[in-house]
UniProtKB/Swiss-Prot annotation:
It is an enzyme of class 6 (ligase). The keyword DNA damage does not apply. Gene3D superfamilies: ATP-grasp fold, B domain (3.30.470.20), Phosphorylase Kinase, domain 1 (3.30.200.20). PROSITE patterns: SAICAR_SYNTHETASE_2. GO terms for molecular function: ATP binding; phosphoribosylaminoimidazolesuccinocarboxamide synthase activity. It comes from Cytophaga hutchinsonii (strain ATCC 33406 / DSM 1761 / CIP 103989 / NBRC 15051 / NCIMB 9469 / D465). GO terms for biological process: 'de novo' IMP biosynthetic process. Keywords: ATP-binding, Ligase, Nucleotide-binding, Purine biosynthesis. The keyword Coiled coil does not apply. This is Phosphoribosylaminoimidazole-succinocarboxamide synthase. It catalyses: 5-amino-1-(5-phospho-D-ribosyl)imidazole-4-carboxylate + L-aspartate + ATP = (2S)-2-[5-amino-1-(5-phospho-beta-D-ribosyl)imidazole-4-carboxamido]succinate + ADP + phosphate + 2 H(+). Belongs to the SAICAR synthetase family.
Amino acid sequence: MNAIKETRFELPGQTGFYKGKVRDVYYVADKLVVVASDRISAFDVVLPRAIPFKGQVLNQIAAKMLAQTADVVPNWILSVPDPSVSIGIKCEPFKVEMVIRGYLAGHAAREYKAGKRTLCGVALPEELKENDKLPAPIITPTTKADEGHDEDISREDLLARGIVSEADYIQLEKYTQALFQRGTELAEKQGLILVDTKYEFGKVGDKIYLIDEIHTPDSSRYFYIDGYAERQAKGEAQKQLSKEFVRQWLIENGFQGKEGQNVPVMTDEIVSSISERYIELYEKVIGESFKKPEESNPEERILKNILKAL
């Protein structure tokens, strides 16, 4: 199976094109046609080899999760004409990512270990251990940097800097809490804990929409419910479902995206094992078996399905 490294379509009515780290975005009238390529990024670097089926895994998880939360928050999706494509409403994105955390993990745990007891203006209790459940989920927004890394920001700073209006931010907070609640319920049905995740929103006129992907292993962290309490009691690492395994492989091979470091050689075996892990993620998060497309030329299939949908 060929991986989808990139697409370069000329679509009827196309007014623009944007190549993201892993997505190819086509602007067609008031719509976005988003192709989830098989490119993979870690440490803000796109790795040299694409991972077969990765784009399909993320696109299909996001599409299913958007469908399962559409009663909670209106979202951008209009159709999913191909396993690797979503077509939706073109929104003006807010320049903030709404990160919500139910547990002390990842970035929050690193900050806590360094002695910080407030994160984005939110006070954290003493005596927490890494991966402990927080008393209640906390929202820790980050600014969306046009270049470079995103930055943590407090609600007060967001409003003071005029990044978002107070009325809109109140709505974003409500939507974020409601989505996390639904995401937590969906995860529990699959024997998983939704640890933390991020949501992005955009606006058309006065209406706010949920945009981009949600509850995927690239935008979220999941733990397994089974054995969680025992591992916490023993101080053991939690078994997690995310793309952390890719980062771990890179770190073990001397790469963390720092200057002067080279990306390690990705053998066919490594590419194949990452692909299998993504498929496993899909099946665990969604609870259905993954269907591989049979075509030898995925770009041809994708273009045909986009043209039919437009």
